[in-house]
Regions:
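Long, charge-rich alpha-helical interaction segments
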Residues: 148-185
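Glycine-rich phosphate/diphosphate-binding loop of Rossmann-like nucleotide-binding domains
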Residues: 18-46
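Short glycine-rich or small-residue beta-strand-to-loop segments that form or flank ligand, phosphate
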Residues: 10-20, 52-56
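Extended, charged alpha/beta regions that create polyanion-binding interfaces
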Residues: 1-9
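Conserved small/polar residues in nucleotide/adenosyl-binding loops
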Residues: 197-202
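Gly/Ser/Thr-rich active-site loops/lids in small-molecule metabolic enzymes
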Residues: 32-35, 98-123, 155-162
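A structural-propensity feature for long, helix-poor, extended segments
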Residues: 50-72
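Glycine-rich phosphate-binding loop
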Residues: 66-117
Length: 208
């Protein structure tokens, strides 16, 4: 509905994340691999002009990503912003297997406790569609998933069934917090990443 009713429209694709960190490079990789055409859309009679931006992370720029995006949006005046980012999973099975879609924007870094200003319509001034893919999982989640499988296994045993019953009374959140408390401090904030395969971009293939 954002661009369907317009004869011509501009879309800004925002690739969030650190291109130098494999599991956080999803956003920049998407921008690298999409067809950017805004610079010749008018001459070519293209209906939807696509621009791309990979602003990096605050540690690289010293600026909030939202500040950079707001400045670009003010100049570019896109009809809609599509933000792509890596997410932290709360279930190991979701790594690289699920996609989260939202029309409410996105808050970079929130999945790993690194809270930054959100990329939302209220902040940047245009509608924001967010696409997220889980690419990292923390150590407590891996331990929790392992424990869940272990408890399912011992539930089949008459002698150990009572142990499984005790833990079944805990909610998933309570189990996760319990594991965070007993796991070593060095492991609590450790994240495991998935390798993302990156194919040559259209621009690389054209040699430009």
């Amino acid at each position: 509905g954002y661009i369907r009713e317009k004869e011509k429209a501009t879309v800004l694709v925002l690739g969030l994340g650190n291109a130098d960190v494999t599991a956080d490079a999803l956003g920049p990789d998407v921008v690298k691999n999409i067809e950017i055409n805004r610079h010749y859309a008018k001459e070519a009679g293209i209906q939807v002009a696509v621009a791309g931006l990979a602003p990096g992370v605050m540690a690289q720029t010293g600026m909030e990503t939202a500040e950079l995006v707001r400045g670009v949006v003010r100049q570019l005046k896109p009809d809609v912003l599509i933000a792509i980012d890596s997410l932290a999973a709360r279930d190991s099975s979701r790594l690289n297997t699920t996609i989260q879609l939202s029309s409410q924007g996105i808050h970079p870094g929130s999945g790993v406790g690194n809270h930054r200003v959100g990329i939302t319509e209220d902040v940047v001034g245009v509608p924001v569609l967010a696409i997220g893919v889980p690419t990292v999982v923390d150590a407590p989640t891996i331990v929790n998933d392992t424990m869940e499988n272990f408890l399912k296994a011992i539930a089949q045993s008459k002698e150990l069934k009572s142990v499984s019953r005790i833990f079944s009374e805990y909610s998933p959140r309570e189990k996760y917090e319990l594991i965070r408390e007993v796991i070593s401090p060095e492991m609590v904030n450790m994240y495991v990443t998935c390798l993302l395969y990156t194919s040559p971009s259209p621009r690389d293939q054209r040699g430009s």
